[in-house]
């Protein structure tokens, strides 16, 4: 799922399955055979391939578990698997820093499409279009995109709606703000939008922030503003950061941002 490109992203190792694997391993050291038996409830009719692939993602791609003398053990602090939120933040901090993976490259392409995504009405057309336009992703197919969508939604890149993803990075942006913002800036204090974006570009490397911000990030900023988690403001004579224009939206630019203290 998060291997170097080209990687045929699989549908089977979903976030929920990978987390379930980790929580089972956390209970006690266990062999992979016993883990598969436990997760399949010893039902011979259960396809164990999804379990095997989920173990591989947790073991080899996310470093959540490790194999010691034939037994799987947890390789991270148990707090990381204590909730879907903590798990999501751990995964995000890793996968978006690996810029040579198919997952990262395709994510970056998707975010750059903006409103064009709405014309790519199914996963097959999205895969074909990307493969035609991005030489490095020419091997991409529908199954890979079907695997990508579960993790994309879980990590907060957008919302699944039928056969498409609605570009709104609200959850991804909120995670970064809640875990990283206070390390650099003060909450409840307006800072320049240019300073915020310069900082944010390093935290969201999958987003191209040169020029006008893409739709997914613009939607996230507007959503967090409406939820009073942040406040976007335009001050006279301040340098504007342009959001992706949406007709009827009251905020299409800002010069300052205030992050509210939780």
Feature-to-residue mapping (PLM):
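Donor-sugar nucleotide-binding helix/loop cap in glycosyltransferases
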Residues: 1-262
